[in-house]
Amino acid sequence: ATGQYAFGL
């Protein structure tokens, strides 16, 4: 998931 935890995942 993109931006799920502000890591760009």
Swiss-Prot record:
Protein's recorded name: Carcinustatin-11
Homology family: Belongs to the allatostatin family.
This protein's UniProt keywords: Amidation, Neuropeptide, Secreted
GO BP terms in the entry: neuropeptide signaling pathway
Localization per Swiss-Prot or TrEMBL: Secreted
Domain of life: Eukaryota
Modified residues (Leucine amide): 9
